[in-house]
Amino acid sequence: MINFTTNTYTLKREILNFSNKISRKLSKPNRKFTADMTYGMLASGSCLLTDVVDQLHEDSKKVNSVERLTRHLNKGIPNAALSSYLHTIRKWVPNEPVIHIDDSDIIKPDGRKFEALGLVRDGSKSTDTKNVYEKGYHVTEACVMTKSNHPVSIYSKIHSSKEKTFTSVNNVTFDAMERGKAMFGK
């Protein structure tokens, strides 16, 4: 019979080792946040903070743990963590990398109170002859293929034309291309 507890702890150790690699230059609270989010999302199979907190099994109240994670998320990704993450990924990629860049959309047709909710072309409903616009957000994602042909994200941004700092979708796409160029010098 397989010992599932041993497998669980082995998997948790591997997740925490990866988390420590990408957060070693961060402060202790940021390292804890990185470990908690990485483990919580993988263990729960969800990105909902309440589901993540359920997997952490902390002694504090659930609402307090969700607030702690929310505060860290609002700060954004520290540059040191991003740099470590991209450096780690670089080791997994072949000499001639394949980078996929995808400009997509997230549609929220019933959304009323979402922050910076703008109009986007609904790729699911639009055709060559007809464009359908819905409330939602633009999504730009860049992934690189590893040596074992697994896609790994190197750039991900959700953006809206209603944001004050928004310039154009093309600028965000070019940022994703620049990230790939800077990582691999191609």
Label the predicted regions.
Residues 11-33:
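Basic, short loop/linker segments at the boundary and entry of helix-turn-helix/winged-helix-like folds
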Residues 14, 18-21, 40, 55, ...:
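Residues that form generic nucleotide/phosphate-binding pockets
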Residues 66-147:
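Active-site-proximal, Lys/Arg-enriched surface segment
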